[in-house]
Amino acid sequence: MFTLQLQQSVLDSLRNLKNIDTLKKLFWSQLNYERINQTLSRRKLTEAVANELIEEPLLLASGGTNNAFHVIYSRLKSEELSRQGERKIVDHLLKEHPYALFIFSNKSHSRWHFLNVKYDNTLQKRKLFRRITVGEDEQLRTASEIISRLDLEDIPANASPLEIQTRHDQEFDVEAVTQEFFNTYRKYLARWCNYRVNLDISN
């Protein structure tokens, strides 16, 4: 369940995300996904996809009915997080992993992308890629809030992979997150204005 304590714990992990072990802890222990830790065969990768990677993609974790929602980690050859390279890899992996969160790091594990592809029944229409960037120069408060809300304990135990995908799609919706922020800001601003009015009247 989402709590401020969980968000702080996730924030600490994101700030210290320098290796795969921290990523495993994040999903296995903090967000309660099932441990898989299984490499995906390089033989199934196209040459174009394999050329982007320093090693085979890792099926890190899973969730939902039959563990059919997947968390997949890929380490790129480059120090840059190439969006074009990520798209090549994701377009390939989506064919066998339609319900998934994709995570990328650069070669040195100093920068990361958590990548959501909004679900559509037609694979060819899945073109909306949304990313959370994690790195030393990034502001991670919003990232920690979004990722905390992916906690499987906050999703029914018998949820289908589509239901988990839908939760991910909702949490990566920047417009919704922005609207929630402004709604909260407006609420507190209204309270402050009422406080000032009451203060002026009492004076």
List each model region and its residues.
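Short, basic/polar, glycine-containing "phosphate-handling" surface segments that engage DNA
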Residues: M1-N203
